[in-house]
Amino acid sequence: MKANLEHIALGTHQMKSSDEVVSNEGFIQYGSDNLFPQYLIGLYQSSPTHTALVTSIAQMVYGDGFMPHDLDSRLAFLSWDMADQLRKCCVDYKIQGGYALEIEWSLDRSTIANVSHLPFENLRACEVNDEEKVTHYKYSANWADSAVEAIDIHTFNPKYAKEFPTQVLYVKPFSPGSFYYPKPDYIGALNYVELEREIGIYHINNIHNGLSPSFSIHFKNGVPPIEERNAIRNEIESQMTGSKGAGKVWIT
């Protein structure tokens, strides 16, 4: 007699893609969904140990701060509030593995008028030119929303100050296996950072559900038709997979 057994897939972890993929618009997607930087920020905001480490290490990177020696540079540094801008860069550097600065040239294009921090997660590289150099970046305040138009920003180059008075200085260390984007130094620990987040979600859901255990039910009144079994299996998988399924009770 053939046993009627159904396999219930209660979830398999898939690592977030950080692949560099050429889009139809000519820029390089960061991850298969183009949201890997946003994923890193999500981990920073949801894993307490990771949050504490990133915050403290970013403070150590900043150290005692920065201050130019000559008077003119010091005045510009203070007027641009560069201390605060560089603090933000240090946080980006720790979370993302790189940082970016917006450079604005003066009206006569002879000097730099302002320097400010650009959120690293909002920038995407355009394809390299014949010299294998990135000359432009795309900036969008919300890459998850295709209705938000991305604007072009030229990479920092004083030779093109007249044509492009607003430029971006994109700083990224060498990352093995990557060309356009850096990787954070904790890239090998992402599973463990995510694990801490999921453990917290699992336990808080258990608390909200009165610490009641999740369990399965065996049908004693015969085997349902295949369509009904598939519907039951899909419902169980959707409701009980992952940390959000903790403590849920099924009644039949």
Regions found by a protein language model. Give the residues of each.
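Structured, contiguous alpha/beta core segments that scaffold functional sites
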Residues: 1-252
